[in-house]
UniProtKB/Swiss-Prot annotation:
Protein name: Chromosomal replication initiator protein DnaA
Gene3D superfamilies: 1.10.1750.10, 1.10.8.60, 3.30.300.180, P-loop containing nucleotide triphosphate hydrolases (3.40.50.300)
Database matches in SMART domains: AAA (SM00382), Bac_DnaA_C (SM00760)
GO cellular component, as recorded: cytoplasm; plasma membrane
Source organism (scientific name): Yersinia enterocolitica serotype O:8 / biotype 1B (strain NCTC 13174 / 8081)
Swiss-Prot/TrEMBL keywords: ATP-binding, Cytoplasm, DNA replication, DNA-binding, Lipid-binding, Nucleotide-binding
Binding site for ATP: 170, 172-174
Sequence segments annotated as region (Domain III, AAA+ region): 126-342
Family to which the UniProt record says this protein belongs: Belongs to the DnaA family.
């Protein structure tokens, strides 16, 4: 049996799985082949259960492919693989992947769980106790982000450091930041967890410079157990703040202290931020949060209504969720308005009542046919992610919806072909033109494509 068995499995899994899933769940595994048994070691119980639940069939299938009649037994354990023993063959996870350009030095402080408190500094946590994992509504759009955040809360300073969450406004990034903070402090009551908006870091640094207290500023930020910074894109063009955060970032990572960052865009797409910082943002795990799909939007509304002791009929929740697709904050704001109107008037919450209470918001939504809106609608219709439409993937399950979205953008907006191409991952105008012609051809040849196009036009224009 080849000593490279696990490397072969890894190579195939890397091809078959989305990059985020592979990095998050498969790459942390260690493997050891001994006495016809392949032992896979997960860093914690959470990862072990997830891999066994989601990827066991994939792994068993690959073992059958590679080993034929000599398939080894598969065993899962929590922890690290033991030191190399006689007659055993260690198997490492060395598949081709980007490697961080520096080697981290050994930690210069005790491990996270054993780090002593430093009472001479006063830490302002700012973590909102109301935002927890329990009241975060999970769906396909945020499942990976929630799972990564949960693991960081259980094992801060571990494999996913830094954790970088990105996505549009109002999708739950801030909620997850607070949930991680609450999770860490639940495990260790005196944990030094600091949450802040990136602008607060800038303000603190400016104040420290003005008061000749920069050393105290450095000591404060470099001695926390976990630093949670929201909207890191606001560091753009603030060179001195970036310089200081660069050194803070390095110090925290070397000390095994957890860093979690959020942004409205992928790290490499943040303009005005130094390349060395953007590179470091991707050293751990980067996860996108997509706009919630219909089922998740309905669940969010029902949970919010339940928290307010309001009976929300399912058909009303569906009516609201179907018309407000952009983000969680907009959904919750709309529901708050409906609840307030119901309380003021004493009327029952029905679809007709919601039409009246939200008439201006619904009218505005009906006028908003933008490329972003088209992308979200098409992604939801074909049950893929917006990120897939913007990616370089060429499989038919992604390429055809991408062509459909481009054709709809040309049909329903005033954007030029180059502008549409730019909105779809920087493609050129000839790609957009080809997509439009292809969909036009398929609408004549395929009843399904013709129906899809009509349904999407109706949804976007209604």
């Amino acid at each position: 049996m080849s000593l490279s068995l696990w490397q072969q499995c890894l190579a195939r899994l890397q091809d078959e799985l989305p990059a985020t899933e592979f990095s998050m769940w498969i790459r942390p595994l260690q493997a050891e082949l001994s006495d016809n048994t392949l032992a896979l070691y997960a860093p914690n119980r959470f990862v072990l259960d997830w891999v066994r639940d989601k990827y066991l069939n994939n792994i068993n299938g690959l073992l059958n492919d590679f080993c034929g009649s000599e398939v080894p037994l598969l065993r899962f354990e929590v922890g690290s693989k033991p030191a190399v023993r006689a007659h055993s063959h260690p198997v490492t996870a060395s598949v081709s992947a980007p490697v961080a350009p520096v080697t981290r030095s050994a930690p210069v402080r005790p491990s996270w769980d054993s780090s002593p408190a430093q009472p001479e500094l006063s830490y302002r946590s700012n973590v909102n106790p109301k935002h927890t994992f329990d009241n975060f509504v999970e769906g396909k759009s945020n499942q990976l982000a929630r799972a990564a955040a949960r693991q960081v809360a259980d094992n801060p300073g571990g494999a996913y450091n830094p954790l970088f969450l990105y996505g549009g406004t109002g999708l739950g990034k801030t909620h997850l930041l607070h949930a991680v903070g609450n999770g860490i402090m639940a495990r260790k009551a005196n944990a030094k967890v600091v949450y802040m908006h990136s602008e607060r870091f800038v303000q603190d640094m400016v104040k420290a410079l003005q008061n000749n207290a920069i050393e105290e500023f450095k000591r404060y930020y470099r001695s926390v157990d976990a630093l949670l910074i929201d909207d890191i894109q606001f560091f753009a063009n603030k060179e001195r703040s970036q310089e200081e955060f660069f050194h803070t970032f390095n110090a925290l990572l070397e000390g095994n202290q957890q860093i979690i960052l959020t942004s409205d865009r992928y790290p490499k797409e943040i303009n005005g931020v130094e390349d060395r910082l953007k590179s470091r943002f991707g050293w751990g795990l980067t996860v996108a949060i997509e706009p919630p799909e219909l089922e998740t939007r309905v669940a969010i509304l029902m949970k919010k209504a339940d928290e307010n002791d309001i009976r929300l009929p399912g058909e009303v929740a569906f009516f609201i969720a179907k018309r407000l697709r952009s983000n969680v904050r907009e959904l919750e704001g709309a529901l708050n308005r409906v609840i307030a109107n119901a309380n003021f008037t004493g009327r029952a919450i029905t679809i007709d009542f919601v039409r009246e209470a939200l008439r201006d918001l619904l009218a505005l939504q009906e006028k908003l046919v933008t490329i972003d809106n088209i992308q979200k609608t098409v992604a939801e219709y074909y049950k893929i992610k917006v990120a897939d439409l913007l990616s370089k993937r060429r499989s038919r399950s992604v390429a055809r919806p991408r062509q459909m979205a481009m054709a709809l953008a040309k049909e329903l907006t005033n954007h030029s072909l180059p502008e549409i191409g730019d909105a779809f991952g920087g493609r050129d105008h000839t790609t957009v033109l080809h997509a439009c012609r292809k969909i036009e051809q398929l609408r004549e040849e395929s009843h399904d494509i013709k129906e899809d196009f009509s349904n999407l036009i109706r949804t976007l224009s209604s």
